[in-house]
Amino acid sequence: MIGKEVTLQDIVLELNELQPEVQPVDLFCEEELPSEQQETEEELPERTAYKVVTPCGCCKVKLRIFVNATQFAIRTFQNLLFEELQLLCPECRGNCKHGGS
């Protein structure tokens, strides 16, 4: 650039002169993306049937329930049964008030 005013010739640069190895990329390449249905099928975690045996929270009679759950869900359910959740048998359920003691 010579002088006080900038000319277009001073600004326009040829890309090939600066980096001859740079080539334009075709964004419509031959790559095939999976359909949305295939993606959702792959993302679903595997479920397994489990038999859960736990004592009633009041009378301690053995209760059995059957669930279909993921590994994460059955571990979470197990932790709840050990810590904060108690299942009740039909007889004890009648003796308790809903939502309270």
From Swiss-Prot:
Pfam family, one: E7
Motif interval(s): Nuclear export signal: 74-82
Subcellular location: Host cytoplasm; Host nucleus
UniProt-listed GO biological process terms: DNA-templated transcription; symbiont-mediated perturbation of host cell cycle G1/S transition checkpoint; symbiont-mediated suppression of host innate immune response; symbiont-mediated suppression of host type I interferon-mediated signaling pathway
SUPFAM superfamilies registered for this protein in UniProt: E7 C-terminal domain-like
First and last residue of the signal peptide: none
Ranges annotated as unnamed zinc finger: 56-92
Residue segments, region E7 terminal domain: 1-44
Quaternary structure note: Homodimer. Homooligomer. Interacts with host RB1; this interaction induces dissociation of RB1-E2F1 complex thereby disrupting RB1 activity. Interacts with host EP300; this interaction represses EP300 transcriptional activity. Interacts with protein E2; this interaction inhibits E7 oncogenic activity. Interacts with host TMEM173/STING; this interaction impairs the ability of TMEM173/STING to sense cytosolic DNA and promote the production of type I interferon (IFN-alpha and IFN-beta).
Protein purpose: Plays a role in viral genome replication by driving entry of quiescent cells into the cell cycle. Stimulation of progression from G1 to S phase allows the virus to efficiently use the cellular DNA replicating machinery to achieve viral genome replication. E7 protein has both transforming and trans-activating activities. Induces the disassembly of the E2F1 transcription factor from RB1, with subsequent transcriptional activation of E2F1-regulated S-phase genes. Interferes with host histone deacetylation mediated by HDAC1 and HDAC2, leading to transcription activation.
Name of this protein: Protein E7
Gene symbol of the encoding locus: E7
